Amino acid sequence: MPLSLTCPFVSRIALSSSVAMVLTLTVLVSPVSAASGPSVEQATQPTGAQDFREPDFLFSWPRTYVGVAGGWLATSQRGGIFDLTRDLLTVEDGDFNSGVARFAIGRALSRRFDLSAEVGFSRATVPSEYLDFLEGDLPITQTTEFAQAPVSATVRMWLVPRGRMVGRFAWVPAAVAPYISGGVDAHWYRFTQFGDFVDVVDLSIFSDTFESSGWAAGAHVAGGISAHLIKQLFLTVEARYGWGATPLSNDFVGFEDIDLDGLQVTGGVEFVF
């Protein structure tokens, strides 16, 4: 009798061959998977370059700095031309207060003392009109400008050092360092009034410009703090009071010296190197 192709013996042979093939593929694939596993893990691990952070210290004590600051100037506005301006015109106390900017470059003399050269600038512009006079039904208007630019030499003393040396080559900045300072000023100013005015003799109205400008010797004292931001950059906050006075020019005859005193409150940044 012919052999049937579907007999149990042949089926067992085919099944055994299939099982053997599956086992063989499993053995071959397993080493490849095992070998590829660590490679994936290694790819996800950070490299030394990714872990690098720039050190927050300097490799030497910084001896030079440049700085810029801005803030508010409250001028004293006492006496003389300021009193007359407030008496005749619609100008109030505090109208000559203004923003102020200052640039500095300095050099460390020692761990506790700096010497710097500074230039500041401020300008107030105040529109006004006469309090007691009209031109018909119209106000008599004018403008007063008061500009100042002190050029200063300043010595700054740190109450605690701005940083410390670690070993021979690393300088670590202090988080916060307070200081006091003082210096002398060559104080430039310009006081200008332009527009329409009333002649006190015959009460006639005329247009003109009156100006006084020049230099005055002065001085200042200050106190502040320096806070480390990043590496070579520091934030500074300072309060400063300055003194100065000088005679007015010939456009303003019979007045006492113009008062240049004022309080500055500023914030800024300094870059050390």
Locations of regions flagged by a protein language model:
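Gram-negative (and chloroplast) outer-membrane scaffold detector with strong preference
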Residues: D51-P55, W61, R107-V198, V265-F273
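N-terminal secretory signal peptides that target proteins for export/translocation
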Residues: M1-I13
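Generic early N-terminus positional signal peaking at residue ~5-7
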Residues: L5-C7, T26, S39
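Bacterial N-terminal signal peptides
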Residues: A14-L28
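Outer-membrane beta-barrel transmembrane domain signature
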Residues: R107, M157-M165, F169-D259, L263, ...
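Short glycine/proline- and aromatic-enriched beta-strand/turn motifs that initiate or cap beta-hairpins
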Residues: S33-R107, F191, E270-V272
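Extracellular/periplasm-exposed beta-strand and loop segments of Gram-negative cell-envelope proteins
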Residues: T75-F96, F121-V151, H187-A216, G244-G262
